[in-house]
């Protein structure tokens, strides 16, 4: 005789009746019930639905965007992440800035960001977008970092970054989205107009480009004794008026 006999139909019905009459008793989860019910939270369900529906607004201004264009092809296939490029900011929840941002384009970028619905995210792609890149030292029009205009969630350094780096940024952004809560999104503060404010601390300085670059102290011609000693000819652009007359006289 088996030590644990299989209960018959009458015993099972009696046990179910006792559970109904005494609901405080500890319930038993059957195998069928455990295989057909998923326990989750509203945050996880909402974030799971948004992970595969990131619709980007592509804001490409320079050579970095050519690397992003490679993702559209079949070799990389960014559709696997559910990325659907949109042409309208009202239909996008992600804006990808790739390339140099100039002062003249800054108001347009801020306006596009403000027209996007919440929640919205920003990916800064390339050195020119993050810090100004090669134009950060002497350019009078390049913005030294797009984060001075709009808040950035993920940075992709490189000049230009490869498509694999863009995939890595998308994965990191998906992790950030999956950890958000409804309470956190409800308490997001409104974006301020950081591009321009009346209380700025800008100071007027002398212009850098004055047209007198060759007349600076570091660009003056060497003494005539030195040029004669080493036999170095004087470039016409660096020659003074007196030296030019001497050259013309032979």
From Swiss-Prot:
Binding residue positions for [4Fe-4S] cluster: 63-64, 128, 159
InterPro entries: NADH_UbQ_OxRdtase-like_20kDa (IPR006137), NADH_UQ_OxRdtase_20Kd_su (IPR006138)
Subcellular location: Cellular thylakoid membrane
Membrane topology annotation: Peripheral membrane protein
Subunit field text: NDH-1 can be composed of about 15 different subunits; different subcomplexes with different compositions have been identified which probably have different functions.
One Gene Ontology biological process: photosynthesis, light reaction
Function: NDH-1 shuttles electrons from an unknown electron donor, via FMN and iron-sulfur (Fe-S) centers, to quinones in the respiratory and/or the photosynthetic chain. The immediate electron acceptor for the enzyme in this species is believed to be plastoquinone. Couples the redox reaction to proton translocation, and thus conserves the redox energy in a proton gradient. Cyanobacterial NDH-1 also plays a role in inorganic carbon-concentration.
Designated name of the protein: NAD(P)H-quinone oxidoreductase subunit K
Species: Rippkaea orientalis (strain PCC 8801 / RF-1)
Entry-linked Pfam families: Oxidored_q6 (PF01058)
